[in-house]
From Swiss-Prot:
Binding site for S-adenosyl-L-methionine: D143, N189
EC number: 2.1.1.297
GO biological process, one term: methylation
Lineage: Bacteria, Bacillati, Bacillota, Clostridia, Eubacteriales
Binding site for substrate: N189, P190, P191, Y192
Protein family (similarity comment): Belongs to the protein N5-glutamine methyltransferase family. PrmC subfamily.
Family matches, as InterPro entries: DNA_methylase_N6_adenine_CS, HemK-like, N5-glutamine_MTase, PrmC_N, RF_methyltr_PrmC, SAM-dependent_MTases_sf, Small_mtfrase_dom
Enzyme class: transferase
GO molecular function: nucleic acid binding; protein-(glutamine-N5) methyltransferase activity; protein-glutamine N-methyltransferase activity
Protein name, entry field: Release factor glutamine methyltransferase
Length: 285
């Protein structure tokens, strides 16, 4: 089968599922199978696809038909201009999370911060991106999920950051607290979706992405309360705490931080002009 015919067939399959990106998804998956870029598909529409590659392609199309996210099928995701390995068991990094990373990098440059802890690291996208772009910074990436630890270690190796990034399995900040370790920054994209919102999520999210990385308790704020309280034991005075938040959680998260003695609380918006990041500084001496 030629490229043009394979794409037409794939378009038809995915269009039936109301996938608004059916053409893009079909092209991404064929590019992945053929190990060619999408320009090749456009300029070589008469190219004959080998039988084994064709079978693999339509296996992937059927996975996408069942709403499996493209990033889980290809096990690849771009974040902050870097390539990350992702798979089922870890959350797929979102473009909006880049705003959190950029805010942290800004504070590092302004304050010469040297030590960062990324809590609920998942694939390691946040902590590893910070380490990649802030050359003098040491980062600890922590997660309770063994899958997250394994995947983040793959990404650490892929980005050649073994010398400055430590990855450990643990519950939030418990292990750093036990060691008496101190940080200039605690950053986290914790689970923040309310329990009653889970059934309303898109199928590709609720059916495939790990629930442990999504649910933030009855009101979505459980992890903000815990991390904020624990961070006072590891953050240096004047240190930064940086959160990704749900678009309706800015006031509640800001109140949690204020009640725990944090100051200079700031909210930043995402690409859709929705509240997405809250930053605060630990007060005291």
């Amino acid at each position: 089968m030629k490229i043009k015919d394979a794409l037409i067939k794939a378009y038809s399959v995915l269009k039936e599922t109301n996938d608004e990106f059916y053409m893009e998804d079909s092209q991404i998956l064929l590019s992945y199978v053929l190990k060619k870029d999408r320009i090749f598909l456009i300029t070589n529409r008469e190219y004959e696809i080998e039988e084994n590659s064709l079978k693999q392609y339509f296996d992937y199309i059927n996975m996408r038909k069942k709403k499996m996210p493209i990033r889980y099928i290809t096990e690849k995701c771009e974040f902050m201009g870097l390539d990350f390995h992702v798979e089922k068991g870890v959350l797929i990094p979102r473009p909006d999370t880049e705003i959190l990373v950029e805010a942290v990098l800004e504070y590092i440059e302004l304050n010469n911060y040297k030590k960062v802890c990324d809590v609920c690291t998942g694939s390691g996208a946040i902590g590893l991106s910070i380490a990649k772009y802030a050359k003098d910074v040491e980062v600890l990436c922590s997660d309770i999920s063994p899958d997250a630890i394994r995947v983040s270690k793959i990404n650490r190796q892929g980005l050649n950051l073994e010398d400055r990034v430590k990855i450990e399995n643990g519950d939030l900040l418990e292990k750093p607290i036990e060691r008496g370790e101190k940080f200039d920054i605690v950053v986290s994209n914790p689970p923040y979706i309310r329990e009653d919102e889970i059934p309303k999520l898109m199928d590709d999210v609720k059916d495939y992405e790990p629930i442990i990385a999504l649910v933030g308790g009855e009101d979505g704020l459980d992890f903000y309360r815990r991390i904020t309280s624990m961070s006072k034991k590891v953050l240096k005075p004047g240190g930064l705490i940086a959160y990704e938040i749900g678009s309706d959680e800015a006031n509640e998260v800001s109140n949690i931080l204020e009640n725990e003695g944090f100051v200079s609380i700031e909210t930043r918006k995402d690409f859709a002009r929705m509240d997405r990041v809250v930053l605060a500084v630990r007060g005291g001496l």
